[in-house]
Design a protein with these regions (language model features):
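Acidic/Gly/His-enriched mid-domain segments of enzyme catalytic cores or analogous surface patches
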Residues: 1-60
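Long, charged alpha-helical interface segments
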Residues: 77-150
């Protein structure tokens, strides 16, 4: 029997949103400050990209959102900073979700960046390695941060 305390969205099969996007829209409209999507990283590439875009929808509205899986964690930064302790056996990647992300700084890693411009047509931030606690910050634009098992 279903737990009545957990809301269930009854959605039509044919709709403009994916199920994940509908859930993210609902959570944003309900005023949630953080959204965690589990088991949304595997399977079809088109769905993964759609899930990342759903994170962007939340981010544009000031809501922190992440995709969490067994072997990876994905989240976005916009005019923000984050500190991530070393995760042995995992890489750290940063990519531009928007056309460009300005003033990207990464320290505590093998390949640091200082006040860099990161664009979505050049993957300069892929597969970095921890040398200590990583500090990541960015200005204008949306930065995609990925911790993935090597």
């Amino acid at each position: 029997e279903r737990d009545k305390r957990v809301p269930v969205l009854d959605l039509p099969v044919e709709k403009d949103d994916t199920d994940t996007m509908a859930a993210v829209r609902w959570a944003v409209s309900e005023g949630f400050s953080e959204i965690r999507l589990y088991c949304a990283l595997g399977g079809r590439l088109d769905h993964l990209m759609g899930n990342i875009q759903a994170l962007g929808f939340a981010c544009e509205r000031g809501v922190k959102a992440s995709l969490l899986g067994r072997d990876a964690r994905v989240f976005l930064l916009k005019n923000d900073a984050v500190t991530i302790p070393p995760l042995p056996g995992y890489s750290l990647s940063v990519l531009a979700l928007t056309d460009r992300v300005e003033h990207v700084c990464i320290s505590g890693v093998k390949y640091p960046l200082q006040d860099a411009l990161v664009t979505n047509t050049f993957p300069i931030g892929v597969s970095n390695e921890w040398e200590g606690t990583a500090n990541i910050s960015c200005g204008n634009g949306i930065l995609l941060v990925i911790n993935a098992k090597k």
